[in-house]
Amino acid sequence: MGRAFEYRRAAKEKRWDKMSKVFPKLAKAITVAAKEGGGDPAMNAKLRTAIANAKAQNMPKDNIDAAIKRASGKDGIFSEITYEGKAAYGVLIFIECTTDNPTRTIANIKSYFNKTPNASILTNGSIEFMFARKSAFEFRTDKNIEELELALIDYGLEELESRESEEGIYHIAYGDYKDFGRLSEGFEHLNIPISKAALQRIPTSPISLSETQMQDIEKLLDKIEDDDDVQAVYTNIE
């Protein structure tokens, strides 16, 4: 059980890192944010967060600037769409995409499921209710964490987790997805730099898998996450 848990935790961390280090995906997030709220980060909290995520992954400034400018051009038109599916062992998969060609994207997503035994695409709405939408902010700080927690409650904080990695202790703040902007502003007001920030979908009834089962499921998840149009993948695996 211990080894399986460690594998699942490492797999989830690997997926987050792999997703966030792909510059094209980061660029799309910046372009979409600029398209929605304007290209001035000072007036657009979503854009500020997208830029912060990109900088945390060492994305060059020229790439960031180009992604913002793309929002005002014809090639800056993207659709944000979701897909739902299931796989072996009771695994549920929720996929968020940003694409300039939905026909291409759904064809690719379907092919990943069709080529995987015991996996299939579901009708949208089939499993969305089994995930709670949350704002998530990862950060490191030397400040008193209890005092910081109390301060962040005023900005919509619901839960604060502390975890340990090779680089030391880091924290993840969770809030309702509607409070993403408020929490982002809270971190700015408190001068706490954010390492990563995103809207996440947390499973309400997570399931446990063995290490062997997890390795099997990872094959499908890797295919999905390698798709350039895929921004995030969520499962009900704990």
UniProtKB/Swiss-Prot annotation:
Keywords: Cytoplasm, DNA-binding, Transcription, Transcription regulation
Protein family: Belongs to the TACO1 family.
Superkingdom assignment: Bacteria
Major place of residence: cytoplasm
GO BP term (any one): regulation of DNA-templated transcription
Listed InterPro entries: Integrase-like_N (IPR017856), TACO1_YebC-like_2nd/3rd_dom (IPR048300), TACO1_YebC_N (IPR049083), Transcrip_reg_TACO1-like (IPR002876), Transcrip_reg_TACO1-like_dom3 (IPR026564), YebC-like (IPR029072)
Pfam family, one: TACO1_YebC_N
GO CC list: cytosol
GO molecular function: DNA binding
HAMAP family associated with the record: Transcrip_reg_TACO1
Protein name: Probable transcriptional regulatory protein HH_1604
Subcellular location: Cytoplasm
